[in-house]
Amino acid sequence: MFNVILFTDAPYPHHKIRGYGVHRIASQIRANGYTCLVIDFSSALTFDKYKEIIDASVGPETLMVGYSTTWLRYRWPELPGEFTNQIPGHHIGEQHELSHTKDEQHDWRKDNMVVKFGKNEVEEFLQYPKTINPKLKIVLGGAKADFYMDLQNVDHVIFGIAETMTIDLLDKLSGKSKRIFNKFIDHDRKAHADTWDFRESSTRYTELDFIQPQETLTLEVGRGCRFKCAFCNFPLIGQKNVNDYLKYPSKIRDELLENYERWGTTKYFIVDDTFNDSTEKLEMMVKVMRDLPFKIKFWCYTRIDLLAAHPEQIELLKELGVAETFFGLETFNDQSSKTIGKGMPSSRRKDTLYRAKEVWGDRVWIEGGFMIGLPYETQASWRNTVDWLKQADCPLDISTCYPVNIVKKSERNQWFPTSWFDNNYETFGYEFPHDGIEGMLAWEKNDGTDINSFIQAQEIADATTKELASYQRQRRGDFYTSSFNHPLLFDREKTLDMSQTDYNKLVNSIDFNQLFFDHTNRDYFIPLLKLLKGRNV
């Protein structure tokens, strides 16, 4: 039996990827002397299987059962039982929603935990642990906690980065502390308390995670960002000294080596807000990797203006093993770029994209993200961007575009992470003239441009996506599909060598919903329950 049991889902719909945040919290919990079990893949977890896990893991010593909201559906607390298709700017949320809707055609998907959370029909899940131990606490956390703060049968909701707050709560529940907590816990949203040091931290997995060699795990090298883009609502932006949140090289090396020796892991999502925020950081990582007996491949967020200012970073990233990267380009309208804190001229950014593609080659996927509806952006300037994206030599393999994400000021914003734009949108003529839930998202503006509303921006984004479809390269061997223990998909290098036609035939022949369910059961839930039940005999 365990002091803490935590549930999470896959970051990408129906692919065998672990929800990193819960494993990070679990590592911190164990480092503070508590036992913790993480349960992944909640979207393949029916209530019957959930009961088996709770029966085998909850006992008198259990202090809390927690549920991460990060990869759940977006929903409005004000509309119980209903959920949104998309929050502006969050394309993963849209994919989750569409995928889960299709899944409800399958009997095994109608009653899984993620669907039940989204429909506010999760009472039996939340109530069941207390039938075994009435004293334990039911706790929510994660990036969408504010979308689920209305749920009944929840004792506490933790907002923000939770390493320190989780330990504070556990110390209270275990009797180590007399601190009093309200239902909503947010006293250290940025995990700045001096009771821990991120630089000394590591995320460790256990035999109860049943990790397989083909899986892609997540790595944090640093935390936070020294930039402060106007649209960004991440909690640790604008940090002056990023080295205060950069892991020590020995910690990174040990984490990579342990994952390789125990699980055979060589693929990673590096989730730093800006992986290339300094050349020194990349040089440190090169030294770490040269000291390891294996190479890694990884996906990361990068800034193109930093590659332009420090071109040596292009070669450093290649040596490190970059395989996929995402650039938040936002716009090629130079006046718009300056407004949001990305003022480098578009011509220089484009030149750097060409240089990166030349050095990295076609086996590295470059994705660019764009926002529609920024100040000064017009339909004509956006058309210039689309025409460039359609050029045969465009260095971007994939381009995604979404309406500008601004949230109307309201009382609930105290729980909702907000950006500079969210707090100052009137400065550029944005307004929210409509009431109700939909009105919280549907901005309008009259600034002399001809993109004047969220609805119009969404229509332009949809039309652009369709127009660019035949110009985009389809990912082959991406880190999501190659995390399956599938005879063809698991070998990323082989799928990269396939022709586009052969790869299309392969992926079109696979029911990924069924594959996800079958593999998580065969390779995870069945052996996990066997091991848990064996421990209790």
Label each residue range with its predicted role:
Residues 1-255, 261-262:
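Acidic, low-complexity intrinsically disordered segments
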Residues 149-168, 316-324, 386-401:
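Structural recognition of alpha->loop->beta junctions
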Residues 283-290, 377-396:
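Short, electropositive alpha-helical surface patch
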Residues 194-365, 372, 387:
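Radical SAM [4Fe-4S] cluster-binding motif and immediate context
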Residues 2-7, 30-31, 51, 57-62, ...:
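Radical SAM enzyme core and accessory elements
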Residues 32-34, 125-136, 153, 262-263, ...:
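A structural motif corresponding to the C-terminal end of an alpha-helix
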Residues 38-40, 140, 300, 368, ...:
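A structural preference for short, hydrophobic beta-strand core positions in alpha/beta folds
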Residues 13, 71-78, 144-150, 227, ...:
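Flexible glycine/acidic-rich beta-alpha junction loops that bind and position SAM and/or redox cofactors
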